[in-house]
């Protein structure tokens, strides 16, 4: 469930596969889910390269993953692959956090991975001109501050002090944004594409939940009947 919720918001993804073990059952599941929720681009990282002595084995794993990607509609032949070891890179950075590119082969492989992401996954065009809208993904309370809701802003721009509506499931209510945070940094504004935490004035945790949306007042109307296309997953 968490993988689907997160993947549905992605502009691209890094598929991590063990170079030592090859594709696992969850590898197939993640590729399928990525396709079904509309992840447009994937870059593959073959992890644990330090455990593979045979270059042919590494090539075989890459071939397997490319075929698997092709089976689910991704361009397997064109997707970038980067091999490395996240553990070895982390160990070296932990020992020397000022390490620069070109000074360690394992750290360089992570740089190469991010190069592949930058080159293969295009920077998306954000819809910042339209009115603010964000689906609620999670809600939690911060002692002494209030209720925070998290999610990905679908469109528009939001600022501290703005008035918004909480729409869906219950009576529509109005509140004021008293704080914005992203990746533990306080912001003055958030915009389309940001995964953000929004601190709401006078709202209790019990009053808001996943399935509701935050929106500019008067722009979203809740409905009890609608048409939808549903993809059902079994356990």
Curated annotation (Swiss-Prot):
It catalyses: GTP + H2O = GDP + phosphate + H(+). Its EC number is 3.6.5.3. It is an enzyme of class 3 (hydrolase). It comes from the Eukaryota. PROSITE patterns: G_TR_2. Residues 1-125 form the tr-type G domain. Its main location: plastid. Keywords: Chloroplast, Elongation factor, GTP-binding, Hydrolase, Nucleotide-binding, Plastid, Protein biosynthesis. It is found in: Plastid, Chloroplast. One of its GO terms (cellular component) is cytosol. GTP binds at residues 47-50. It holds the Pfam family GTP_EFTU_D2. The keyword Magnesium does not apply. Belongs to the TRAFAC class translation factor GTPase superfamily. Classic translation factor GTPase family. EF-Tu/EF-1A subfamily. This is Elongation factor Tu, chloroplastic. It comes from Gracilariopsis lemaneiformis. The gene is tufA.
């Amino acid at each position: 469930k968490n993988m689907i919720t997160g993947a549905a918001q992605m502009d691209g993804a890094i598929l991590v596969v063990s170079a030592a073990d090859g594709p696992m059952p969850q590898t197939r599941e993640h590729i399928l889910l990525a396709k079904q929720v509309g992840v447009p681009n994937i870059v593959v990282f073959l992890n644990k390269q330090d455990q593979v002595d045979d270059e042919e084995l590494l090539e075989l794993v890459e071939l397997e993953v490319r075929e698997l990607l092709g089976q689910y509609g991704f361009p397997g032949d064109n997707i970038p692959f980067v091999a490395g070891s996240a553990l070895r890179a982390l160990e070296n950075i932990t020992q020397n956090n000022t390490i620069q590119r070109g000074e360690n082969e394992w750290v360089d492989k992570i740089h190469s991975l991010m190069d592949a992401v930058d080159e293969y996954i295009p920077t998306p065009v954000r819809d910042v001109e339209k009115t603010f809208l964000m689906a609620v993904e999670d809600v939690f309370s911060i002692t002494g501050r209030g209720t925070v809701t998290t999610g990905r802003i679908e469109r528009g721009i939001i600022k501290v002090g703005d008035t918004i509506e909480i729409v869906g499931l219950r009576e529509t209510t109005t509140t004021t944004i008293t704080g914005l945070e992203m990746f533990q940094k306080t912001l003055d504004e958030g915009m389309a594409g940001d995964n953000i935490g929004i601190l709401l004035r006078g709202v209790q945790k019990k009053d808001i939940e996943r399935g509701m949306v935050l929106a500019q007042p008067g722009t979203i109307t809740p409905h009890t009947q609608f048409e939808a296309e549903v993809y059902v997953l079994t356990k």
